[in-house]
UniProtKB/Swiss-Prot annotation:
It comes from Pseudomonas fluorescens (strain ATCC BAA-477 / NRRL B-23932 / Pf-5). One of its GO terms (molecular function) is translation release factor activity, codon specific. This is Peptide chain release factor 3. The gene is prfC. Keywords: Cytoplasm, GTP-binding, Nucleotide-binding, Protein biosynthesis. One of its GO terms (biological process) is regulation of translational termination. InterPro entries: EF-G-like_DII (IPR053905), EFG_III/V (IPR035647), G_TR_CS (IPR031157), P-loop_NTPase (IPR027417), PrfC (IPR004548), RF3_C (IPR032090), RF3_dom_3_sf (IPR038467), RF3_GTP-bd (IPR041732). CDD domains: RF3, RF3_II, RF3_III.
Length: 527
């Protein structure tokens, strides 16, 4: 095996998906702890004392002007190199969150045991399904009251349309939480709470029918055996191929806050999740073991500190090896660039990088020339697919405070749209400008950046748009007919693509029924 193939085989690149408050930040900290990437896991404080549920070193990053370690973290674990991509949680939920999922090979879904499957989780799972991403599931918060575990598995299957195969099964919960039983291994992992940075030694009881197991479960023993028989009769068994095909998810139980069960999940990622996969480009499929370098941009992070104008473009390496100072071809512009200052996100520091391999994520300094979806190679003209725009879910009409600045406004919005900060639509029948976003915070970010960078002040007005759909139709005559009939609701997006702005869900359903030859797409590739 070449050194490069060996490096690729070590890589595991995954993202965490969850609804806000399911415990994602705590899990991220505990995962870093496993990789010894942070010596002390800062406990997440209550909302009142600390609006941002982040550990202290992330806070330092904010003061330095760019919160970048919260996006990508690389750490070693069991002789593997783990790349963990965070998907923003609360108010900073945006299209970036969806796009991050195009750069990973697997995902960890975190569910709150008391709440089950929640709306944000459903939206993120829909995106994972576009690429049949393998999903590992962690049902969190067993140190509190949770819903019936069988009910939770049923809900995963019914709502997320994926088979659920329990790997561990909880013994009690809240004050009675005694640990988990490993179904295939026939052993109990005993729960001893370990908060903060304590790595408690794991105690294992072999064999469920042992005297020690009976003593540990006490009065609960018979009831647990009955429940287990029910589970084994009703639930799916783990099948690695179905997992890799995105059809089945292995389910683990634990409590991130109590530092219990997180290592089981990380072991599953190392043992079962795929190493970096081949990526499809328009021209051909690119294997990670290929010698020549290639990668694509899936996210651009603007700096929230106006003093620093640097923006970081996040690149997923698809093949070859990055070496400091190497020359790359920026395929869209046709220009060759020398990259001497790419960033890696090892543990808690932004570091200058010497080398990186397929599966790794690196950061390029971007002075406005790089767009989402751009491909970089060692000369070959490749364009990777599967980095889409997603239909926005929130819309606002933009109003200019100074009408003489409409040119700057258009220019600013065009730039911000290319960067993925927002989507912009120009209705065919009016001079309005409509912004689309996935999270409310995106509108605030756009307004503040227009003011800082383009000296344009704007305000927003509500508008009756329920969703946007990109229009495709191979029959020119039908398309013309449709365009004439639907002109009131048609717009061009920032890239000049025809878009239907549906005022209501019912309206969209009617239009789709009425125009079977017209395709109403909820995603559009970056070109």
């Amino acid at each position: 095996m070449t050194q490069q193939a060996a490096e690729v085989a070590k890589r595991r690149t995954f993202a965490i998906i969850s609804h806000p408050d399911a415990g994602k930040t705590t899990i991220t900290e505990k995962l870093l702890l496993m990789g010894k990437a942070i010596a002390v896991a800062g406990t997440v404080k209550s909302r009142k004392s600390d609006r941002h549920a982040t550990s202290d070193w992330m806070e330092m990053e904010k003061q330095r002007g760019i919160s970048i370690t919260t996006s990508v973290m690389q750490f070693p674990y069991r002789e593997h190199m783990i790349n963990l991509l965070d998907t923003p949680g609360h108010e900073d939920f945006s299209e970036d969150t969806y796009r991050t999922l195009t750069a990973v090979d697997s995902a960890l879904m975190v569910l709150d045991g008391g709440k089950g499957v929640e709306p944000r989780t459903i939206a993120l799972m829909d995106v994972c399904r576009l690429r049949d991403t393998p999903i590992v599931s962690f049902i969190n918060k067993l140190d509190r009251d949770i819903r019936d575990p069988i009910e939770l598995l049923d809900e995963i299957e019914a709502v997320l349309k994926i088979k659920a195969a329990p790997i561990t099964w909880p013994i009690g919960c809240y004050r009675d939480f005694k640990g988990v039983y490993h179904l295939a291994g026939d052993y109990i992992i005993v729960y001893t709470p370990g908060h903060g940075h304590e790595r408690t030694e794991t105690k294992i009881i072999e064999k469920l029918d042992s005297a020690e197991a009976r003593a540990h479960l006490g009065d609960e023993y018979e009831r647990f055996i009955e429940q287990l028989e029910l589970v084994q009769g009703a639930c799916h068994e783990f099948n690695q191929q179905e997992f890799l095909d995105g059809q089945l998810t292995p389910v683990f139980f634990g409590t991130a806050l109590g530092n219990f069960g997180v290592d089981h999940v990380l072991d599953a990622v190392v043992d079962w999740a795929p190493l970096p996969l081949a990526r499809v480009a328009n021209e051909r499929s690119v294997a990670p073991q290929e010698e020549k370098f290639s990668g694509f941009i899936f996210k651009i992070q603007a700096n929230m500190d106006p003093k620093h104008r640097d923006r970081i473009a996040f690149m997923r390496i698809c093949s070859g090896k990055y070496e400091k100072g190497m020359k790359m071809r920026h395929v869209r512009t046709g220009k060759d660039v020398r990259i001497g200052d790419a960033l890696t996100f090892f543990s808690s520091e932004r570091e200058q990088l010497e080398e990186a391999y397929a599966g790794d994520i690196i950061g390029l300094h971007n002075h406005g020339t790089i767009q989402i979806g751009d491909t970089f190679t060692e000369g070959e003209a490749l364009g990777f697919t599967g980095i889409p725009h997603f239909a926005p879910e929130l819309f606002r009409r933009v109003r200019l405070k100074d009408p003489l600045k409409s040119k700057q406004l258009r220019q600013g919005l065009q730039q911000l749209a290319e960067e993925g900060a927002t989507q912009v639509f120009f209705p065919e029948r009016s001079n309005d400008i409509i912004l689309g976003a996935v999270g409310v915070l995106q509108f605030d970010v756009v307004a503040s950046r227009l003011k800082e960078e383009y000296k344009v002040e704007c305000s927003y007005e509500p508008i009756t748009v329920w969703s946007a759909r990109w229009i495709e139709c191979s029959d020119k005559k039908k398309l013309e007919e449709f365009s004439n009939k639907a002109v009131e609701n048609l717009a061009l997006d920032g890239g000049g693509h025809l878009t239907y702005l549906a005022p209501t869900r019912v309206n969209l359903a009617l239009m789709e029924e009425r125009w079977p030859d017209v395709k109403f797409r909820a995603t559009r590739e970056h070109h």
